[in-house]
């Protein structure tokens, strides 16, 4: 397999899936898109348009089970991931699953158990910040040790507006799930407890949602991480993280790029959403996943990482309503992920 192109099937052709379709077809090497599955036929057809020989299905299982599909990219909503992941594991093919692995820890654990039973890592979770050059540099800097031990991290995660149907719980398991993963990945330790506080809400929040929310994450060694999650901030997409260490600080996600001076004002621009902000990270993620899949492995967050993030999300969702500091319940890490 390592000498020939990876034949990829895409399941879910919405915002993220169609972006990945273009990426597989045009921006990465060693892989081609051979099938797209979405219950919405028009979306599937649009994603496959112009790609010679790319078949279109309305039944996602037909893509996962197609004999000419070597690997799958899963870009359906998180609540639909479990059965699709289990089907890919059953068939023994690699799958890049968009975050979250699943929205709750019980279903995430079932995915981990299926992979453990299969005896090999097939699932990679699409935590793309791990491939962002700024985040990668922050990780290298923290691990090099010149700043001393990390004590605190301050994160801001802002979206211009939440899509219809987005709930308060999704602010945790669909959005803050990124900070749960980056915390574990940057610091190399588990999350032990989560608290959530609610400041005065923006009038732009739909009914039933208070927005923004302030999440506090505690880690095993006692680092505290604050996350402002604000999904209807109105002005654009902004993701920041500042690590405060014994000997200094390091920050990523600040304003950079071109600034202009025009009509008596100066300034730059803010990305409208995750696609331009993390394009380089997504490209790198897909390239490294495809290379690893051809070699029979994964190169990124594992199903275990997705499961640990889901356990933190579950504590976060409970903390949202109780107002209490909520410990994270995480099972022991299976040997497959040592
Ligand atoms: N990494 C990131 O920054 C990032 C950004 C956006 C979305 N995502 C993730 O990507 C996934 C998709 O999000 P989106 O914004 O593209 O959603 P979307 O609603 O735009 O698209 C989802 C698509 O999945 C299809 N679908 C629904 N159920 C299905 C099923 N059972 N089988 C096959 N297709 C099904 C829908 O018809 C739709 O076309 C989610 O897991 C989301 O969290 C990740
Ligand atoms: O699915 C999206 C995506 O993961 C974005 O990166 C995040 O900023 C949004 O909050 C989330 O809803």
Curated annotation (Swiss-Prot):
It is an enzyme of class 1 (oxidoreductase). Its EC number is 1.1.1.18. The keyword Oxidoreductase applies. Keywords: NAD, Oxidoreductase. SUPFAM superfamilies: Glyceraldehyde-3-phosphate dehydrogenase-like, C-terminal domain, NAD(P)-binding Rossmann-fold domains. InterPro entries: Gfo-Idh-MocA_inositol_DH (IPR050424), Gfo/Idh/MocA-like_OxRdtase_N (IPR000683), GFO_IDH_MocA-like_dom (IPR055170), MI/DCI_dehydrogenase (IPR023794), NAD(P)-bd_dom_sf (IPR036291). Belongs to the Gfo/Idh/MocA family. Involved in the oxidation of myo-inositol (MI) to 2-keto-myo-inositol (2KMI or 2-inosose). This is Inositol 2-dehydrogenase 4. It comes from Saccharopolyspora erythraea (strain ATCC 11635 / DSM 40517 / JCM 4748 / NBRC 13426 / NCIMB 8594 / NRRL 2338). The lineage of its organism: Bacteria, Bacillati, Actinomycetota, Actinomycetes, Pseudonocardiales.
């Amino acid at each position: 397999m390592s000498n020939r192109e990876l034949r990829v099937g895409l399941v879910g052709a919405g915002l993220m899936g169609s972006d990945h379709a273009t990426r597989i077809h045009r921006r990465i090497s060693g892989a081609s898109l051979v099938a797209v599955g979405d219950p919405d036929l028009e979306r599937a057809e649009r994603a496959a348009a112009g790609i010679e020989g790319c078949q279109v299905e309305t039944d996602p299982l037909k893509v996962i089970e197609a004999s000419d599909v070597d690997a799958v990219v899963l870009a359906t909503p998180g609540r639909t991931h479990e059965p699709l992941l289990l089907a890919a594991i059953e068939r023994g093919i690699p799958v890049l699953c968009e975050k979250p692995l699943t929205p709750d820890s019980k279903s995430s654990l079932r995915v981990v158990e299926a992979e453990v039973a299969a005896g090999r890592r097939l699932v990679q979770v699409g935590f793309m910040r791990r491939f962002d050059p700024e985040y990668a540099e922050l990780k290298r800097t923290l691990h090099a040790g010149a700043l001393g031990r990390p004590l605190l991290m301050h994160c801001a995660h802002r979206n211009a507006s939440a899509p219809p149907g987005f709930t308060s719980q999704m602010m945790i398991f669909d959005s803050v799930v990124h900070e749960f993963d980056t915390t574990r990945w940057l610091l190399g330790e588990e999350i032990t407890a989560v608290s959530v506080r609610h400041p005065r809400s923006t009038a732009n929040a739909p009914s039933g949602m208070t927005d923004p929310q302030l999440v506090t994450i505690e880690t095993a060694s006692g680092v505290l991480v604050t996350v402002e999650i604000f999904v209807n901030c109105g002005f654009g997409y902004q993701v920041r993280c500042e690590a405060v260490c014994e000997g200094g600080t390091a920050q990523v996600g600040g304003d950079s790029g071109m600034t202009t001076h025009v009509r008596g004002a100066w300034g730059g621009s803010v990305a409208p959403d995750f696609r331009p902000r993390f394009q380089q990270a997504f490209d790198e993620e897909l390239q490294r996943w495809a290379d690893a899949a051809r070699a029979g492995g994964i190169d990124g967050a594992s199903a275990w990482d997705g499961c640990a993030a889901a356990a933190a999300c579950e504590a976060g969702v409970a903390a949202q309503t109780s107002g209490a500091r909520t410990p994270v319940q995480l099972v022991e890490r299976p040997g497959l992920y040592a």
